[in-house]
UniProtKB/Swiss-Prot annotation:
Its EC number is 3.4.22.-, 2.1.1.-, 3.6.4.13. Gene3D superfamilies: P-loop containing nucleotide triphosphate hydrolases (3.40.50.300). It catalyses: ATP + H2O = ADP + phosphate + H(+). It comes from the Viruses. Residues 1538-1705 form the (+)RNA virus helicase ATP-binding domain. Residues 495-674 form the Alphavirus-like MT domain. This is Replicase polyprotein 1a. InterPro entries: (+)RNA_virus_helicase_core_dom, Alphavirus-like_MT_dom, P-loop_NTPase. One of its GO terms (biological process) is viral translational frameshifting. Transmembrane segments: none annotated. The active site is at C344, H393.
Length: 1873
């Protein structure tokens, strides 16, 4: 953490900052002096004036130090300066200021400042925590206030800035100085508000405050004055550790090499003034003494001790120069001349002209913190050079250094210091070793070095992968092509996006890299692009760029059209570029730089002309030009055959890629570009330079040369040949006429050499045997390939007609090589013998004749060439060899003669330098980078290597503890052994600690189980026993009531109905067919309790019974039970009396209301409350016989004066009255649910009828309008508005109470049994309406009950509850039903049958007023006689499908009824013990209730009750009732009876058949069209688009969806298309089937996910729709119809759909490429591919290539919880377990679903989890598999147990490992242009 601090606590520091600060402080100092002038003798205290202000920054040590300085300067050794001495007062006009200056100057002299030097303190330091923060400002605003602000230098941190405000808090204790700290944390994200908090220093409230305190204290730790002011002391323990590490590091680095004497010059680094001389003198007493002689001054004697170097430096320092003697001793006692390097830090003090303080010890190496303490760190680090890790060298010759210097680094190393030889290239060795390790197949090793290298290699790879890419390559490339591009441009970080395709993609990528190279080189601005692509420039970050793009030919014109088309679609590109269609040499835009990327049509003269026209200094361009164009037979292939360059005459042809257009360029232009290096144009000389080459891609630059010396210059340029591994062969071919022609081909050098060597080795002469051997070797040398297990030979580059000539050349060359070898060997062998004189003369004659022969031969050949064809002559003459080995280099040489005029032209470089110096003339130090860098650890490179070899690559868990162990071990052994033993000790301690934790945890769990489980079981059975005892008297009472009720029912039997004839009315609402999950208790706790406490259960029960009997006997003897019974009967008599009950209720409501209002107004008093209640009781007693509510109301409000007179405001009267009455009403309603208070509450409610006359004229409708009017008045007159509001609203509630509750209870008292039977029916509504009319005085005369209009829901209420019940009607049964009734001899009851409520499940209030005629199906009405155990098919597919579906639904109802019957029987037999019922049933779909409110699920794992809503329930007599009916004993129900969907489906099917079981309505299937689309193909989107088009054209249409989720998705899409009220046109299949009895006529019908239905279900639906066109969408390969009845097969569920013609689609917008690959290759059980046309992604955004991942788990706890992921399971049990795990970890965005529930949905990330190890058919089902892997767009993760990593999903994901990326990319649709 770099700190930049301006200290404002000490005046000695602030006075040196600037004059303004000094003047301000002088004014502060002079204030006490002006006041002092009025005092006698001008004597006052000097501490405030001399030692600085304010007092908070002064410490005792600073005061003593300053007083000591004043005594020495003023020569007053015993003066305490409490008063100004007289001599000082008389001598100076302002003695306070003068004494302050004297003190300050003395301090400066003490630290080494001279009188003529103005020192500037720059207080910047590094914090001890080293966390990358930088303090930008640090000052005090007032006397006791401190402000610190810090800016974060870490780029990845979220925090931007921290600020502290430290303020001193007043304290009674003068020795305590508490400070309050307010800090603010600013974030980099502007959307996050700053975080502000405060705390007391050294007393943080939380962890955040503690962190802020640590950062604050670490930033001020280096400043003593601030530390003293804040009472902060450094952690001594931490300081000891730092000092030990520092000492160890210093010792390691000082003793590096053996001591060798050296001779140093007297002049250390600069010239030393000749006036200073240093001589060494030796004395017997004093020892060695240096005598420093200066001209004109006295000699100075310096003792040669351990401070001699420092003292000599201070004595000889003069103007930045100093002189040291070689015999001077350092702090270690070593002579200065023996130090090979070090002490460069002396130059720091010399350059600053500062003396070395006394506390500095002259070691050869000095830490940067010492220089910082001396105020020289900022000055020194500008010229620091990093020699090695932790070692710095101060170089006085540097102007600016870029080295990272830290205050913990050591300064003093020599710049020539050489690192250890074996560590010099350590990074390269590690990198090379990591590459070799990564190339191996097996990366496992027990070597710690290998593990460490692998860890670092992986970290390096991760780091490189996270680096931001500079250039995006959008064209598709293979791996070889990508490697080729990255090898050509290793300096560019590229990202390959694979978004487009080209036949020559490599060269498109190369052009992109070349453009980026030039753009980056010139900082993306201020250049001209000759022939550039304007589209690429617009898309890049370039600005102020001019593009010259002329139309030179047809290709340029076509390019312009293509680029114009792209530009028309661009948006958001506003960079400043310019464009013209002129030639570059004809354009006049001024720029200094011109670039051209692969522009081959511009000659060098054109480029020079362009430079002159644009006023440019430099022209840079790139071209692909092979040097072989200088040969006539130029035919080369570059970049592994992707580019072919051929010379044809004077043109050079370029062939890019496998297919494409040919580009032709002038050969002479390309030759000039390669060979010409200097040329002249327009009187100017231009120099072409080859900057660099990347293969045959050359980068050139052209510059204007000025001020050239005249003379001749020879320039050479060389280029490497393109094909270095080839040789040229001239192969003869003889035609049918015997004419021999020669063809030139190129062949691999190694292949040809191997063949020649073989012939030379095996052949003696040319014969048939030699030809056979040569052909055999030729066949063996050809390249072979292995494909599909077969070995095949690849064809060679030699054509078939050239093979004989090629073999002939090989044989001739081989035999000739053999002969030459034989001849030369003999010649050389004979040359070993000394020749005779005759042989010498003979050889001279032969040599002369040989030269003459050559001359005559060549002359005759030249004549023949002149007379005949020279090429043919060359072919005949060149018989030496027909194999030519090509040269490796092409060298071009140019001789240039330069002549110049005498006129001297100014230099361009001089002009640029002058411009730079005039523009940037600031001091380089002021413009330098003042930022600090992060701290680095104290360790040398040797330490790093030791750690690398011994650490093993593990992470440090406890750095402090590790360092502490190392510090102990280091004192006993060497460094290498210390690291090794420290690792072993630390690993042993860590292992013991981990094992200890596990052992303690294990013991703790055992103790916890031993203590908790028996205690929990004991408490559970004690509570159950206590509840059982309490239920004994209630059971007796219930038995008596049961007998009474039975007798009463016999008397009123004529009111009873036949339950079997009741007709149910059900609303039709949408269904997802998804099972609902309920709440679960802690199943483990229950199971453990049962398993461990079964033994003691019986004993505890027996013990409890014995204790209970003894207690009852004891209490009976003591008479306590008798007294308890008396009190209980007395209290019960009070509650059963109506008058007492009303009095108690009035006391509670009146007192509570008055107390509440008194508390709200602040006037509450217990005495006033008691007096108020007594007064009200007296008034109530006096008016008890007179029912005057108004009188009571006035009297009650008058008693409010007991609290306070201003409390009797008019608005409080209606508030008090309304609160009391409403509270009383709600309390009575609640007490009705209590068994003990139910009777007296009913009687009290009935007595309220006498008060109805007070509100008989009150109309609710008018009151509602008055309420709205009061809201308007509130804005005009608040008091009046609130008065009306609080007066009207209680009156409305009271009116409803009288109409709905009081009247009903009075009727119920007369007809209790009848009212109970009629409750909740339409007849009950009629009766209640008649009663209200009877008791109302303004009733209508002559109106029949049947003619009463429909009332609002607020006026029709069931008994005892505030639930709205709409009007109901009774429908007539069908004729077929009547026949069945006649056959069954069922007599019709004179009373109307019982009907269920028709309340729709909707949030709209007014939908509850709809009236329906839905009835129970025939199967339920005539059960069990209506059972049918078989379904007989007729041969009609449509009818058989419908009847099969009807049979399945009836079977489902039969199973549900059987389950209900069994539960009822068990409940009656077991005495309603839910635990016993659960053990016998164990069905989570079944529910039981004892009171009608709390329902208990009958699963063994479920314990907690919940509120459920059912359409039908079964009572204890197995009578089916309405879901909200009153439960007397108990009731049971199941999930099926929530909506009774099967009943509604059966009713819809029954309407299709008449009494003779004939179909009266058949579905129309002629206009249907079926479309089979794969997952993610946009089925819902297609329907939405078609419907939107129909609705806009006013065409009647309807869309049906299988699930509610699909319906909502379709509605949402229609809303986005602008369709109003789209819910009218979109329904679910069940909703439409249940709610529509009439036939709907439409034009277009759209069905979504049609294959999820049973065919009979779909056909039944079509009978209710008359359509013209039907469009059905689905996927036959996804989850089909699921038969819930395990005993009834569904043979025809999909038969109808199989008969239809399906239109198949192959496109998807959702699935990634690997998912498309799996779906395209997926086969069914018969081996047929389910998606015959495959599945391809057609999304415009390039999809994810690999998205499927596989993970093995052991338990559900190992499944990671990802907030944005969607979790799927195969079964419901897995879903519940996974949901419980996710909820325990904090939950996620989406709830867990099964695969079936997720069909049709799309998610970004999907996690499929399998928790069970046993096989389930669902998990291997192909339809489940298709849905599971096709729900995601980016990522899919499959978590399965390790033992099931071979299931279907795992095998499919694992198979993708052997599929390459380029294979997967084929499943992305690409449109060819």
């Amino acid at each position: 953490m770099a700190l930049e601090v301006e200290s404002a606590f000490s005046l000695s520091y602030l006075l040196k900052e600037n004059k303004q600060t000094s003047n301000n402080l002088f004014s502060l100092i002079q204030v006490p002096y002006t006041k002092m002038t009025h005092a006698k003798g001008k004597k006052t205290h000097l501490l405030r004036c001399i030692l600085g202000s304010p007092f908070e920054t002064l410490t005792k040590s600073s005061i003593r130090r300053s007083l000591k300085n004043l005594r020495e300067v003023c020569n007053l050794p015993y003066c305490n300066f409490k008063k100004i001495p007289k001599n000082i007062s008389y001598k100076y006009q302002n003695p306070f200021l003068k004494l302050y200056e004297i003190n300050n100057n003395f301090i400066n002299c003490k630290v080494g400042a001279t009188g003529n030097t103005n020192s500037t303190y720059d207080w910047r330091n590094l914090s001890t925590i080293g966390n990358g923060w930088s303090v930008t400002s640090y000052h005090n605003d007032s006397v006791s206030r401190l402000h610190v602000s810090m800016v974060n230098n870490i780029p990845n941190s979220n925090t931007k800035k921290l600020s502290w405000w430290v303020t001193r808090v007043r304290s009674k204790n003068p020795w305590k100085r508490p400070y309050k700290v307010i800090y603010q944390r600013d974030f980099r994200d502007d959307g996050i508000k700053p975080y502000v908090s405060e705390f007391i220093l050294y007393a943080p409230k939380n962890r955040a405050d503690l962190e802020m305190q640590s950062i604050l204290l670490s930033s001020v730790e280096c400043f003593q004055d601030i530390k003293y002011a804040l009472n902060y002391w450094t952690n001594l323990k931490f300081k000891e550790i730092c000092n030990s590490a520092l000492k160890r590091f210093t010792q390691t680095n000082i003793i590096i090499t053996p001591v060798k004497p050296r001779v140093v010059s007297v002049n250390k680094a600069r010239e030393v003034s000749s006036s200073v001389e240093v001589k060494l003198q030796r004395y017997e007493r004093e020892g060695e003494v240096f005598v420093v002689s200066k001209a004109g001054k006295e000699d100075t004697r310096v003792l040669n001790d351990d401070n001699a170097i420092r003292n000599l430096f201070n004595a000889t320092l003069n103007g930045g120069k100093y002189k040291l003697h070689p015999e001077a001793k350092s702090a270690t006692g070593k002579r200065f001349k023996y130090y090979k390097d070090g002490f460069c830090w002396l130059d720091v003090f010399a350059d600053a002209n500062r003396r070395i303080p006394e506390w500095v010890k002259p070691h050869c190496l000095l830490t940067g913190s010492v220089l910082m303490s001396c105020g020289l760190w900022d000055f020194a680090k500008r010229k620091m050079v990093s020699v090695s890790h932790g070692l710095l060298h101060y170089d006085r010759k540097l102007e600016r250094s870029s080295a990272r210097a830290g205050v913990r680094d050591f300064v003093g190393a020599s710049n020539e210091a050489v690192q250890r030889e074996d560590f010099r290239d350590l990074d390269l060795r590690v990198e090379e070793f990591a590459e070799r390790v990564l190339e191996t197949a097996n990366l496992r090793s027990d070597n710690r070095l290998i593990d460490n290298i692998l860890t670092r290699a992986s970290d390096y790879i991760n780091k490189k992968s996270k680096e931001s890419k500079e250039l995006d390559i959008n064209v598709c490339l293979s791996m070889d092509e990508k490697k080729m591009i990255t090898n050509l441009f290793p300096d560019i970080q590229m990202s390959f996006n694979q978004k487009s395709y080209s036949n020559h993609g490599v060269f498109n990528a190369m052009r992109a890299c070349e453009n980026f190279y030039f753009s980056r080189k010139f900082k993306n601005s201020d250049y001209i692009d000759a022939g550039g692509d304007v589209v690429s420039t617009l898309r890049s970050k370039n600005h102020n760029v001019h593009i010259c793009s002329p139309r030179l030919d047809l290709k340029d014109a076509a390019r312009h059209i293509q680029r114009a088309t792209v530009i028309d679609g661009l948006k958001g590109y506003g960079e400043t570029i310019s464009f013209c269609t002129n030639k570059t040499e004809d354009c006049a835009v001024n720029r200094d730089i011109i670039i051209a990327v692969e522009v081959y049509d511009m000659t060098l003269r054109d480029m020079a002309k362009a430079m002159l026209s644009h006023g440019s200094r430099k022209f840079e361009f790139s071209c692909i030009i092979p040097p072989e164009i200088f040969t006539k037979e130029c035919n080369v292939e570059l970049y592994e055959g992707r580019l072919k360059v051929t010379r044809i005459g004077d043109n050079v042809e370029y062939y890019y890629g496998s297919n494409g257009e040919t580009f032709s360029h002038s050969c002479q232009t390309l030759k000039d570009i390669l060979s010409v290096q200097v040329f002249q144009f327009g009187g100017r000389v231009f120099k072409k330079t080859l900057e660099h080459s990347r293969g045959q891609l050359h980068f050139f630059s052209i510059c204007i040369c000025e001020k050239i010396e005249p003379g001749s210059v020879k320039l050479k340029t060389y280029y490497q040949r393109s094909e270095l591994d080839k040789v040229t062969l001239r192969i003869p071919v003889k035609d049918s006429f015997g004419v021999v022609t020669h063809y030139i081909i190129k062949e691999d050098r190694e292949f040809v050499s191997s063949m020649i060597e073989y012939v030379a080795n095996t052949g003696i002469k040319i014969d048939d045997k030699m030809v056979e051997w040569t052909y055999s070797q030729y066949r063996a040398k050809k390249t072979v390939t292995i494909k599909s297990g077969k070995v095949t030979q690849k064809e060679t580059r030699i054509r078939k007609e050239l093979i004989p000539g090629f073999i002939a050349i090989i044989m001739s060359e081989g035999i000739r090589a053999r002969e030459k070898t034989h001849y030369l060997a003999k010649m050389l062998y004979t040359s070993h013998y000394k020749p005779s004189i005759v042989n010498i003369i003979f050889r001279l004659i032969m040599h002369f004749l040989g030269g003459t022969k050559r001359f005559i031969y060549e002359s005759l050949v030249d004549c023949l060439k002149f007379l005949t064809n020279s090429d043919y002559i060359d072919t005949i003459v060149n018989t030496e060899s027909r194999i030519e080995d090509l040269d490796k280099w092409f060298v071009f040489e140019q001789n240039v003669t330069i002549t110049t005029d005498a006129e001297d032209q100014p230099s361009i470089l001089e002009q640029s330098v002058k411009t730079f110096l005039s523009k940037y003339s600031e001091d380089v130090y002021e413009r330098g980078d003042r930022s600090e860098f992060e701290l680095e650890e104290f360790s040398s490179e040797q330490d790093l290597v030791d750690q690398l070899l011994n650490s093993g690559g593990g992470s440090k868990e406890d750095e402090w503890f590790y360092s502490y162990i190392f510090s102990i071990v280091r004192t006993k052994c060497t460094l290498s052994l210390a690291w090794r033993w420290t690792n072993r000790i630390f690993n042993f301690i860590t292992s013991c600690r981990a094992k200890g934790k596990d052992f303690v945890k294990y013991i703790y769990e055992i103790i916890k189980i031993i203590i908790n489980k028996p205690w929990e079981a004991l408490c559970h059975y004690l509570v159950q026993g206590y509840k059982t005892v309490l239920k004994i008297p209630m059971t007796c009472v219930d038995s008596v009531n049961y007998l009474k009720r039975k007798s009463l029912e016999k008397i009123l039997s004529y009111f009873s109905h036949e339950r079997a004839d009741d007709e149910y009315i059900f609303p039709g609402y949408d269904s997802d067919f998804s099972e609902e999950s309920g709440d679960y208790g802690d199943e483990n706790t229950e199971l453990d309790s049962r398993s461990r406490c079964t033994v003691i259960k019986s004993k505890v029960e027996m013990l409890f019974r014995n204790i209970k009997g003894h207690i009852e006997k004891f209490l009976q003897r003591c008479g306590i039970i008798d007294q308890y019974n008396k009190i209980y009967h007395w209290f019960k008599s009070i509650l059963t009396d109506v008058d007492c009950f009303n009095s108690v209720l009035n006391f509670i409501t009146h007192t509570g209301c008055d107390a509440l209002l008194a508390v709200l107004t602040g006037h509450f008093s217990i005495a006033s409350c008691a007096l108020k209640f007594m007064t009200d009781v007296v008034i109530e007693k006096n008016l008890s016989e007179k029912h005057h509510t108004t009188t009571k109301l006035i009297a009650g409000n008058l008693t409010q004066c007991i609290y306070k007179l201003d409390f009797i405001h008019p608005i409080w009267i209606p508030i008090r009255w309304g609160v009391k009455e409403i509270s009383k009403i709600h309390i009575k309603k609640k007490l009705l649910n209590w068994r003990s208070t139910k009777e007296v509450t009913n009687e009290s409610i009935c007595k309220d009828l006498v008060h109805k006359s007070y509100i008989k004229y009150f109309d609710i409708k008018k009151a509602v309008w008055l309420l709205w009017f009061s809201l308007l008045i509130i804005f005009l007159h608040p008091t009046l508005g609130f008065f009306i509001l609080f007066s009207i609203y209680p009156a409305i509630e009271i009116k409803r109470y009288y109409n709905n509750v009081v009247c009903f209870n009075n009727i119920k008292m007369s007809y209790p049994h009848v009212i109970d039977r009629l409750g909740g029916t339409y007849n009950f509504a009629k009766l209640k309406k008649a009663v209200r009319e009877k008791f109302s005085e303004n009733k209508s005369q002559g109106v029949k009950i049947s003619e009463i209009p429909a009332e609002k829901d607020e006026d029709v209420m069931p008994p005892l509850e505030e639930v709205e019940t709409p009007k109901r009607s009774v429908g007539r049964p069908s004729s077929k039903q009547d026949d069945i009734e006649d056959e069954c001899n069922i007599k019709e009851d004179p009373t109307e049958s019982l009907n269920f409520s028709n309340i729709e499940a909707t949030s709209n209030r007014y939908d509850t007023l709809r009236v329906g005629n839905s009835k129970l199906c025939k199967f339920l009405r005539f059960y069990p006689k209506s059972k049918c155990y078989a379904n007989i098919q007729t041969g009609d597919l449509i009818r058989d499908s419908i009847e099969e579906f009807y049979h399945l639904e009836r079977s489902k109802l039969d199973i549900e009824i059987s389950k209900m019957q069994r539960v009822v029987e068990i409940m009656n037999d077991t005495g309603r013990m839910l635990d016993n019922v659960r053990r016998m049933i164990d069905d989570r779909s079944m529910y039981v209730t004892l009171d009608g409110v709390s329902w208990y699920r009958l699963g063994c794992k479920d314990k907690n009750p919940a509120k459920e809503d059912f359409k039908a329930i079964f009572d204890h007599n197995f009578n089916i009732m309405e879901g909200n009916a009153k439960v007397k004993e108990f009731a049971v129900s199941s999930d099926e009876w929530r909506g009774m969907y099967s009943n509604e489906r059966c009713r819809a099917i029954e309407q299709l058949f008449n009494d003779n079981n004939e179909m009266v309505r058949r579905p129309d299937v002629n206009g249907l069209k079926f479309y089979n689309k794969p997952p993610g193909a946009g089925k819902t989107t297609t329907i939405a688009k078609l419907m939107s088009k129909d609705l806009k054209n006013k065409v009647k249409c309807l869309a049906l969806s299988y699930t509610k989720v699909g319906r909502l998705e379709l509605i949402d899409k229609l809303k986005k298309d602008g369709i109003e009220k789209p819910e009218k046109y979109v329904k679910t299949y069940d909703s439409f089937l249940m709610n529509n009895d009439n036939i709907l006529e439409i034009v277009n019908l759209y069905c979504d996910e049609v294959f999820m239905m049973h065919a009979g279900h779909f056909l039944t639906l079509l009978t209710k729709i008359a359509y013209q066109n039907g469009y059905c969408y689905g996927d036959v390969n996804q989850i089909p119809f699921i038969n819930r009845d395990p005993y009834t097969p569904a043979y025809l569920s999909r038969e109808f759909f199989r008969k239809q013609d399906l239109n198949y689609d192959t496109y998807t917008y959702r699935c990634p490429l690997d998912t498309c690959y799996l779906l395209s290759n997926l086969k069914d059980e018969m081996g047929n591919i389910i998606y015959a046309g495959g599945v391809k992604n057609v999304n415009e955004v390039y999809p994810t290539i690999r998205s499927l991942n596989l993970f093995g788990i052991n338990v559900v706890g190992e499944v990671p919880v990802e907030y944005n992921a969607k979790y799927l399971t195969f079964t419901q049990d897995e879903k519940l377990n996974l949901q419980r795990h996710i909820d325990s970890q904090g939950g996620c965005r989406n709830a867990v679903s099964t695969v079936n529930e997720a069909q049709g949905c799309t998610f970004s990330e999907v996690n499929l989890v399998r928790l069970v190890q046993f096989d389930n058919p669902v998990m291997s089902d192909i339809n489940q598999f298709v849905v599971a892997i096709s729900r995601h767009t980016t990522t899919f993760k499959y978590f399965t147990p390790h033992s099931r990593l071979n299931d279907r999903v795992s095998n499919a994901i694992s198979s993708l490992q052997s599929v390459s990326d380029f294979v997967l990319k084929d499943y992305h649709f690409r449109q060819c242009l």
